[in-house]
Amino acid sequence: MGIEGVLKKGFITTSADTVLNYMRTGSLWPVTFGLACCAVEMMHAGMARYDLDRFGIIFRPSPRQADLMIVAGTLTNKMAPALRRVYDQLAEPRWVLSMGSCANGGGYYHYSYSVVRGADRVVPVDVYVPGCPPTAEALIYGLIQLQQKIKRTSTIARDE
């Protein structure tokens, strides 16, 4: 659970950061930014076979209700301002997961004049999931890595 110590009389000693980060890891609410074939694998992860709900990950329709953005697919120059706008609307603290070779670094279309060579050029990315397209298992592993990163966060308010 991440609680440092439990005393004999039922008292728990911990920090506010540990409790808040524990709650944040169990309630990630992603907004999807599916741009290409990686979005199909993201949908697979949310369906019955993998069921992201058991990790507390529930997809939200609005960025104002979400704290995680999953960028899945090829990001073009024309779509980059929209990506930034959605990122700015996310609730604080917010995280970004880049899914697939195209979102990570341009992928197959890296040398095209219209492709952004990585989502990290537009928004700060916390976790990269490699693959073309990555499997649903790889996405779940990336989400678990993000949960571990959130647990290690030492401040209540995250600096940009």
Curated annotation (Swiss-Prot):
Bilayer topology term: Peripheral membrane protein
A GO cellular component annotation in the UniProt record: plasma membrane
Location relative to the cell: Cell inner membrane
GO molecular function, one term: iron ion binding
Protein name in UniProt: NADH-quinone oxidoreductase subunit B
Assembly description: NDH-1 is composed of 14 different subunits. Subunits NuoB, C, D, E, F, and G constitute the peripheral sector of the complex.
Organism: Neisseria meningitidis serogroup B (strain ATCC BAA-335 / MC58)
The keyword Zinc is annotated on this UniProt entry: no
Stored PROSITE patterns: COMPLEX1_20K (PS01150)
Enzyme Commission designation: 7.1.1.-
GN (gene name): nuoB
Cofactor(s) the protein needs: [4Fe-4S] cluster
